[in-house]
Amino acid sequence: MSYSAPETPSAQRPERPTARPSERVQIFALPTRTMYGSLRFSWLSYLGLAEQQHAAQLPTSTAAVSYLSTQALMRAMAAARLDVPSSAASEIEVDRSCTLCTSGKKHGKPRIAGVNFNMSQVNPLVVGAFSRNPSAVLGVDVETLDARLFSGFARLALSNEERAFYERVAQERPAPVLHLFSVALWTAKEAVLKATGHGLSVVPSLVRVQLTDDLLDALELAMNEEVPGDLLGSDTPEPTALRVLTQDSLTAQATFSAPRVGNQGGEAAERSFSLQWVPVALPDAENPEHAQKMLI
């Protein structure tokens, strides 16, 4: 999750604990398997006919369910913020126009007037980040711990400083730790680029994450933990509820040298972002002893 304020760089929910109330970031999560259960009709009520028709045209059922889950959670968050009943959530206008090009295509970062949010999804989880601060530049990404990163990740996605750190980790740490480090870096870069709306239209190496051995140690410890509790902080969580693996704050800073848009001249504008990772585990519905770990 990335967050930049002007001054500084059943869905379940954790909160960003150290921020002032006006800058607090909330994370909502919806397992996509919800769409296969009895609650799917409640979630589908948030969606309009156009979204359901679009889902029906997607090539796989997994893609359709992920899309429906993302749109339903997005509209549920917006409805709660705008005090709109769920029966009218499908009428909330979503602006998908791109602010970084003049093509007119609807491939931009989704925006809803009066709601500051960002969405991400990976099978089997959809997450949404929300802030009451309308000026905050907010982005979120989620990846499974076993995610397969693209070939040439270090060469193409990392800055020179990050690559040097990566190569040292590759020499000094076991392969699973190097992979965790790579997933953490990728989620951070994706979150920043989603926050700005650039996405992968720019090279990820323009996002530079400030890395330390302490951060890597904390990430490794968190992903090896099985801490009781779920995102709601319930004393008696359901066996299959999404669980947070640590209450420790996993944070860093990042900078992004944003390319100038259009005919704007001069050097690229540099912006600062605060990063926070939330390690979670989603137990298997049929066998809660086994869980899929993810990094938000």
Would you name each region that the model predicts?
Residues S2-I296:
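Core catalytic alpha/beta fold that binds nucleotide/phospho-ligands
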